[in-house]
Every structure is written in C-alpha cells, then in structure tokens.
Amino acid sequence: MNVNGENNEKIDEHHLESSLAGVPTLPVSPLDHAKDLSQTNPNAQIGDLVTQTANLIAIKKQLLEDIAFNQHIQSMQVRAIQSFPQNNQVAPPFQQFDPRRRGLARMQKPESYKTVICQAWLESKTCSFADNCRFAHGEEELRPTFVEPLQNNKYKTKLCDKYTTTGLCPYGKRCLFIHPDHGPNAYIRADKLLEVSQRHALADIRDQMEQHIMTNGRIAAPPLSAIQHPLEMFARPSTPDEPAAKLPLGPTPVSTRGPRYELPTKELHDAEGAMTYPPSRWPLDPSMFALDAWNMAHRPASPLDSMVLGSAPNAGSFGMLGKQNTPGGVSGYSSAGSTPSQDLSSSSLNAASAAAAAAYFANSAVAQSLLMKSVATDPMMSCNGPFSPMPGFDQLAENMTKHLNLW
C-alpha cells in the first residue's frame, strides 16, 4: 500500500509540474492506470479485466437489439413503398361501402341464366318472381348453353325422377336422364299433357282479364240496348243460360234473392173452376206467396228495389215521387177512407214503405197497362172480386203491407 501511495504522489507531482510549466499533458486512461497497477498488484488487474468484459458484453447486446429494431423499421418502410402505385399512377380516393354495389353484383347474369324452364311456370304458367325469374318462361325465352359436353359414361342410363314421378321435367331434351315415351313434348309426360294444357289455358284467360281491367280501369258496362227493362228483370228469375256479366252493375234484383215471382201466362183453374196456385218453392203456405194477377202487377218493392228504381237515370215514370214527380205526389193524395197510418198495425217503417210503393205502382203508367191487361184476361179480376180494378187506396196499401212484411 505504501508503494502505491508513493506512485500516485509521483504522478500527481508530475501533472502539477507540467501544468505549472504550461506543457499540456495527456490524460491517463484506466487501462494505463491498470497496467501501472498490474505491475504492482495482480489481483487488482484481474478485477478490472472482469469489469471491463462485462461492460463490453452489455454494450454488444444493446447494439444487437438496436440493429434488429432498425431492420424491422426498414422492412416496414420497404413494404409501404412497394404498396404505392407504379408508373406515377394516382391512387383512387377512399370510397365508403355502398350497399347498391352488392345488388349490382347480384344482378350480373350468370351463364346459366334462362337456360332451364321454370318449374312453377311449367306446372301452372304462374310464377311468383314474374319477370325477375332466373329461369325461362317458355321456349321463346330459353337461351342456348355454352357449356362444353363432358364425357359421361352414365349419360341416359337411368330414368328421370322428375319425369317419372311428377310427369314434368324442366330440362326437357337437355336432361341427362331418360324420358320414356315423352311423345311430342319432352317437358311434359303424355298423360299429363291435357291437364297441364288446361291450366295454361286458364292462366291465359286470367291474364287477359287482368290486362283488360288494367287497361280500361274497370269492366265496361253493356250498352243501354242490352240492358233489360227493370220490370222484366224483376218479373222472371235469372237462368243459367243468361251470363251474370249481362246483368246491370248494382244491387241484386229481388228475383235472385227472394221468392221468384213469375207473371202467369194463362189462367190456372182446377176442375171446379176455383183458382189454383203454382207449387211454392218455400216450405210455407203457398197461398202466402202465390199472387194473383192484380197483386202480381202491384207487387210491392223492397226499400232497396225502390231506391234502385228511383235512382235509375232512365226510369222515367218509375220515380218514387208520385204522379206529378214531386214530393207532394206521395203524401198529398186524396182518399175516400182513412189514411194508411190509421189502418196499418205494423211499424211506421213498413207503413211508409207501403205508402211509397203504393203511390209508385198506382201512379205508374206501366202498372196501369199491366192492370188493364190482367183485367181483360183474368175473369177473377172483376169489380165484385176480392180486389176491384180501382180499389181504395187504403185497401191497396194494406194488402201491400202484408206482402211487404214477408221481406
């Protein structure tokens, strides 16, 4: 320890003298200092070497980590540069997702578009997809296929399941299986051809009717010359030979929803000369429904029929306003007896309806002509009979009220 102290003192004195003399001196490195110490103490030299080695290892490890990090950054920069467009092309701006692009992609027609007959159309000529169907609706829409035929050893070696079970195959002649006895139509079996043809015919009729309604807006009404007279329509029932389309649009006539009255064409008498009635169609007393010529000519109209006749544009004298076609014609009548409201025991609604119907039929020129014809042809229609040709208005209203209650 004394030797080291003396050496340090000598070094300090040397530096002090050099600094005082103005001569620059180099700093002593730790290694030189270690050499000086090694000359004096070998244990101190070993400790210094171990410390320096550990420091060098730590520095090397840090340098390796820095190199790896720099290489990673460089590789990322190279990738970013390579992703840029080449040849001075400008990258398109960022576009947001448009849901219509997916729809456009779906609208792209594949090669198999309209190359096979639609199964639903083949069965009944109706398809829920209509024009948007991917399959052909008829041979006129059938497109040729561009798929090259492949070598298939099983071609036409088995029966077609669709053709044999259901009688229909949308592939027709292009089917890879056997269609036994297909006849003139390769899509439909011979025994199913009539049934399918009927379905197609009904579909064509339905399409024509829909097209007619869509073009005209509504079903065209028949001309006035083809429309029957209101009394003729009410006097006889509709027959199956008469199509419903010829009937005028509006409320259903009485003859189609109630007892079917028919004007007697000739007299009905039994052997004793008494008046007989035709068989009734209701399971009630026939005398309540079979009317004589007078009551038939003056059969009261229901409120619905009265409105129909009163609102018809060509009704003429069939208006419900009385003789002079004024409201006073109904209520302002003269009668030898009491008024209908005093004699009728039914409700006020039936009485009012009976009075209106009586005024309508009594004041109608057509009713008068029918009345005179009935009087001329029917011997029972006399002044002494149950109903006189010109009875009192009260009696006429009472009789009509009885029949009006049947409705």
From Swiss-Prot:
InterPro entries, per database record: ZFP36-like, Znf_CCCH, Znf_CCCH_sf
MF term (GO), any: mRNA regulatory element binding translation repressor activity
Annotated localization: Cytoplasm; Cytoplasmic granule; Nucleus
Compositional bias segments (type: Basic and acidic residues): 7-17
Superkingdom of source: Eukaryota
Segments of this protein annotated with the region Required for taf-4 binding: 46-80
Tissues in which the UniProt entry reports expression: Exclusively expressed in the hermaphrodite gonad. Expressed prior to oocyte division. Widely distributed throughout gonadal oocytes from the mitotic stage to the developing diakinesis stage. Expressed in sperm.
PTM-bearing positions, type Phosphothreonine: 239, 339
Impact noted for substituting residue 238 to A: Severely reduced phosphorylation by mbk-2
Keyword Metal-binding: yes
Primary location recorded for the protein, binned into one broad class: cytoplasm
GO biological process terms held by the UniProt record: embryonic pattern specification; establishment of chromosome localization; meiotic nuclear membrane disassembly; negative regulation of meiotic cell cycle process involved in oocyte maturation; negative regulation of ovulation; negative regulation of translation; oocyte growth; oocyte maturation
Quaternary structure and partners: Interacts with taf-4 (via C-terminus). Interacts with ifet-1. Component of a ribonucleoprotein particle complex that interacts with cgh-1 and car-1 in an RNA-dependent manner. Association with many proteins is dependent on the presence of RNA.
UniProt name for this protein: CCCH-type zinc finger protein oma-1
Species name: Caenorhabditis elegans
